[in-house]
Curated annotation (Swiss-Prot):
Modified residues (Phosphothreonine): 451
Kinase among keywords: no
Source organism per UniProt: Arabidopsis thaliana (Mouse-ear cress)
Modified residues (Phosphoserine): 395
InterPro entries reported in the protein's UniProt record: NAD(P)-bd_dom, NAD(P)-bd_dom_sf
Gene Ontology CC: chloroplast; chloroplast envelope; chloroplast nucleoid; chloroplast thylakoid; chloroplast thylakoid membrane; cytosol; stromal side of plastid thylakoid membrane
PTM annotation, UniProt: Excluded from chloroplast nucleoid when phosphorylated on Thr-451 by STN7 that may regulate membrane-anchoring functions of the nucleoid.
Region (Disordered): 1-24, 38-58, 453-493
Key words of the record: Chloroplast, Coiled coil, Membrane, NADP, Phosphoprotein, Plastid, Thylakoid, Transit peptide
Name of the protein in question: Protein PLASTID TRANSCRIPTIONALLY ACTIVE 16, chloroplastic
Disrupted gene: phenotype observed: No visible phenotype and normal nucleoids.
Family named by the database record: Belongs to the NAD(P)-dependent epimerase/dehydratase family.
Length: 510
């Protein structure tokens, strides 16, 4: 949906605590007569200045080609939004994902008519503006409803960007169908899962998912079958089935209501039938899609979603199948959902998580017990080795004592003797012993030291020259014998049987 320029707020909600002036806004510009002016030449300004001298700032709004150009466009809603629980939530604000889809636009319109504020997530803000302008022009939406409509750009890309687009909404609705991402594009189960994950990030309290079962029906067209086959073959990931979607939604922390149905147009005969809500797997639900009588018009499913958001307690964590029946009476939403049991997938998942956590804790405890047992066993081995070493040391000491006793010497005695030797040994005593030994080894001096009295008497004697007596030489002193030269020795031997004699003479070189 889109709005007129005066009633379609496309900017983000103002921060809390900001006060607004309720008086009519007026544009006041203080400028001199020589200030710049728009759209006029200097000559024209001079000619008109005489007539309108009090209004120097001229601007002709009638020459604007389209008032739509004055509407601010939010190209990046993430810059003005804070996702998560940091922003104060509004219990009366609902985020409609795919608000320009065939069912999404009817859901947004019905919610506005019921008094809710709507944040419309759209893939194209320009198209949403056109729709809002048409709705306001033809009175499809009242001025009050248009004021409560806030469109934000929100393609199905990632959960973080969708969470920022959700903003202060406390409830979220998304429709899975072939014409729900705009008027002719598909919203898949994977896209719906992204919306649920974004709702969990944004702190949303309740999510409603409308699943149109006609998207999986056969068109009996060969080209469509070939296109679907090759599309699934070359796709990066296979699309989620509705069962997989419910399983993953049950694993989140957001309360949910999943509606399985087969949608039809509002001008079909089913618009006069009443809605029937049955439990999942019932034959009276949308499973009998072959019968045209059981389909649900889009306006009726939008009315059911609005009733659910008005009383979410009766529809929390339930998966239902919705159809129409001409013979069914009209019932309020609390009667329709009170007989539906709560979906058991979340409880099964919670039990599985608790069981897995208990098994993990038991495994950790078993590992710790095993490690403690191994540590105790290793400690016992170390203690056993230590006791064996102590016994071996004791036996060696006993053998040494026995050997010492055998030779008559005890170990204590040896230690005592060693102590005595070490105590009696000193460097001073050892030095004096060496000095005494050296003095005893020296010869006794020939000159005797006189007594004190003798020394005094010797000092008084006059000095005399010492006379040395020389021994007279004897004339008969024997002369040293001169050595006679040795005669050369001869050696004679007989040769040739005594016929000849050979004489060998040895002469000294001296």
């Amino acid at each position: 949906m889109a709005s007129s320029s005066t009633s379609f707020p496309l900017t983000t909600a103002p921060p809390q605590g900001v006060r607004f002036n309720r008086r009519k806004p007026r544009l006041t510009v203080w400028a001199k007569q020589t200030a710049f002016q728009l759209g006029k030449t200097k000559g024209d300004d001079d000619s008109e200045g005489k007539q309108k001298g009090k209004n120097p700032f001229q601007f002709d709004f009638g020459k604007l080609p389209d008032m739509k150009s004055l509407i601010p466009v939010v190209t990046n809603p993430s810059t003005g939004l804070v996702f998560g629980n940091n922003r104060k939530k509004d219990p009366g604000t609902i985020f409609v994902a795919g608000a320009t889809g065939q069912a999404g636009i009817r859901i947004a319109q019905t919610l506005l008519q019921r008094g809710f504020s709507v944040r419309a997530g759209v893939p194209d803000l320009g198209a949403a503006q056109d729709l809002a302008r048409v709705a306001a022009t033809y009175k499809i939406l009242s001025n009050d409803e248009v004021k409560r409509l806030n469109a934000v750009q929100s393609p199905f890309q990632d959960a973080e960007s969708i969470a920022k687009a959700i903003g202060n909404a406390t409830k979220v609705v998304v429709t899975v169908g072939a014409t729900e991402n705009g008027p002719d594009a598909q919203v898949s189960t994977s896209d719906a899962l992204l919306v649920v994950q974004a709702a969990e990030l944004a702190g949303v309290s309740h999510v409603a998912i409308v699943y149109d079962g006609t998207i999986s029906g056969s068109t009996y067209n060969v080209l469509d079958g070939i296109t679907s086959f090759f599309g699934n073959l070359f796709a990066k990931s296979q699309p989620l089935t509705i069962s997989d979607l419910i399983e993953k939604v049950a694993q989140t922390d957001v309360a949910y209501t999943l509606i399985k149905t087969s949608l039809t147009e509002d001008f079909s005969p089913e618009k006069a039938y009443n809605v029937v809500v049955s439990a999942e797997g019932s034959n009276s639900g949308s499973g009998s899609s072959s019968s045209e009588a059981y389909k649900v018009p889009k306006l009726k499913i939008a009315s059911l979603v609005a009733d659910i958001f008005a009383n979410t307690a009766v529809a929390e964590n339930k998966v239902v199948e919705v159809s129409t029946d001409p013979s069914a009476p009209s019932r309020p939403v609390d009667e329709l959902f009170s007989v539906i049991p709560e979906d058991g997938r979340r409880k099964v998942y919670a039990d599985a998580i608790a069981r897995e956590r208990a098994e993990e804790e038991a495994k950790v405890a078993a590992d710790k017990a095993r490690e403690a047992a191994e540590a105790a066993k290793e400690f016992e081995k170390q203690m056993q080795k230590l006791s064996e070493k102590e016994a071996e040391a004791a036996s060696l000491a006993e053998d040494a004592q026995q050997k010492a006793d055998a030779v008559g010497v005890t170990v204590d005695g040896l230690f005592n003797k060693a102590k005595d030797i070490s105590s009696g040994l000193s460097w001073n005593k050892l030095g004096s012993q060496f000095a005494t030994a050296i003095q005893n080894a020296s010869e006794t001096p020939k000159v005797q030291v006189a007594t004190v009295r003798g020394q005094a008497k010797a000092r008084n004697l006059p000095p005399k020259k010492a006379v040395v007596k020389q021994r007279p030489s004897s004339p008969f002193a024997s002369k040293p014998k001169e050595e006679r030269p040795k005669k050369p020795e001869k050696e004679v031997r007989k040769v040739f049987g005594g016929l000849f004699k050979q004489e060998t003479i040895y002469i000294d070189d001296d």
